[in-house]
């Protein structure tokens, strides 16, 4: 009885929050995230709720502590602010009221991630590996349709990545790369050996984020732009500029 009562109260709070948010934002709150457009200044943001599952791998010396969990999530926020937020600026044209108001203006894009024990858009499994061993590695991945992510404890620090068997190498933060997938750009642009060179038209763009580098590209916003155009009929959103 108590649980159902508490759940009903929480649902009422959620409904009120949604009502207040809808007054300020144009929203597309789907299973992959809450995409918002600020009605006043045109700023675009993507809110992601992550439900973490912390796992100790065989080579980790100790299990996750609460301090380490909080530090990891704090570094997630730091990485997003340093490498994604306010680096991409969109704009809009078209015949809608919104497009008329913001035609040609810079519209900032940002990502916000909050951790939650309920209503998680994404289930995020983080494996603790041996951070002191340079050879300790676990392949990170996402399953888009299931909104499932696997990371490891080294994904918040830069590591050398090389393009196939060539000598082209760059430093990359794994989390930064995985966020590109999470916002809807599903292709990996790198290749693992010389035989794979033709698998993507962007395999030679080694400095790009979805390859082995850290630089953003306008093409990574395709899914976001498709959602924005559906949210505001009569509008044509596009990437205006990208800070590398």
Outline where the language-model segments fall.
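Structural recognition of the beta-strand scaffold that forms the well-ordered cores
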Residues: 45-48, 180-182, 208-211
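Metzincin-family zinc-dependent endopeptidase catalytic domain
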Residues: 70-186, 190-194
């Amino acid at each position: 009885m108590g649980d159902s009562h508490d759940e009903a109260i929480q649902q009422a709070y959620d409904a009120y929050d949604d009502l207040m948010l809808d007054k300020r934002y144009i929203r597309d709150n789907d299973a992959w995230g809450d995409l918002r457009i600020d009605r006043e200044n045109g700023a675009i943001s993507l809110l992601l709720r992550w439900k973490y599952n912390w796992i100790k791998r065989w080579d980790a010396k100790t299990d996750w502590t609460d301090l380490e969990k909080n530090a990891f999530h704090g570094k997630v926020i730091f990485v997003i602010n340093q490498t994604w937020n306010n680096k991409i600026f969109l704009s809009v044209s078209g015949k809608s009221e919104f497009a008329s108001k913001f035609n040609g203006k810079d519209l900032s894009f940002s990502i916000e991630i909050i951790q939650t024990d309920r209503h998680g858009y994404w289930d995020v499994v983080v494996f603790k590996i041996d951070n002191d061993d340079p050879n300790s590695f676990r392949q990170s991945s996402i399953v888009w349709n299931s909104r499932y992510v696997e990371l490891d404890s080294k994904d918040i620090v830069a590591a050398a990545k090389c393009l196939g068997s060539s000598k082209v190498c760059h430093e990359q933060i794994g989390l930064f790369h995985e966020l590109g997938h999470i916002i809807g750009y599903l292709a990996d642009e790198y290749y693992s050996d010389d035989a794979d060179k033709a698998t993507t038209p962007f395999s030679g763009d080694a400095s790009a984020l979805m390859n082995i580098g850290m630089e953003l590209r306008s093409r990574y916003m395709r899914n976001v732009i498709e959602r924005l155009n559906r949210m505001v009929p009569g509008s044509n959103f596009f990437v205006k500029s990208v800070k590398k």
